Amino acid sequence: AIHHLNFQIFLLELNCVLRDSSAFNIQFYEGKPIFIDIMSLKKYEDGEYWGGYKQFCENFLNPLLIGHLKNIEHNNLFRGSIEGIDTILLNKILNFKDKISFNVFTHVVLQSKFLQQDIKNPKATVKKKNELQKFKKTSYMFMLKQLKSWISKLELKKNKSIWGKYEKYNTYNEKSLSEKEKIVAQFVKKIKPNKLIDLGCNNGQFSKISIDNGAKEVVAVDFDINAISNTYEISKKNNLNLLPLFIDLSNPSPNQGWRQ
């Protein structure tokens, strides 16, 4: 979400904008987010509104909010809708206390109301849009920066999980853990893999050891979202070529989406 907003801010300064806000336009390369959909770029037209706002909320903001406010992991919800979490649905889930926030009220409650009006009377909506006043570029920029500031402060609540605190709760004593670290380090030094896949990466401890000892790239996989989040923090903090993926190998994601 932050990467997308940073890119939007960068583009707007160059008088360009994005046509949409799909989360799938961002992939990861060497552990870092990269925007890949060049065809989404277009020239900024004076007074235009953010066309991808609704999609940004569904793909980025709403999944973060449902984790921050309701402690619900969003990952499996994307199976039901790869376009993300519907704003009208999120508005129904949130309670009155959640909605007191100015940001939540603005981006969820009000937007939900407008979307429902669009559904009830689409002709009137088209007419209103044609009569809208121009949206100043300064207002456009302020909206992007305000969203970035808010989102950067959101913290996802972590449920208790099996491997979320792997460093504290595992089957190794100090000696056996040290032996395993040496075995992994020696193996990686000998093989020198271009790409290594760590299945059941836990907190990413051995993924990092692999990179430190010669693996050029590591893909770390686990079904525990807390473990994956911790691994990503390690990757980000140490600037590693490490990509953590939330995957349950006993219940893999189906082949779905465009042309599937």
Where are these regions (language model features)?
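N-terminal auxiliary segments of SAM/dcSAM-dependent transferases
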Residues: 54-153
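Conserved SAM-binding loop and adjacent beta-strand
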Residues: 154, 168-183
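Conserved SAM-binding motif I beta-strand of class I
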Residues: 217-222
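Catalytic activation segment of kinase domains across protein kinase-like and atypical kinase folds
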Residues: 17, 22-68
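Conserved class I S-adenosyl-L-methionine
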Residues: 192-202
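Short alpha-helix immediately C-terminal to the canonical SAM-binding loop
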Residues: 228-229
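Conserved SAM-binding loop of SAM-dependent methyltransferases across substrates and taxa
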Residues: 203-215
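S-adenosyl-L-methionine
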Residues: 232-260
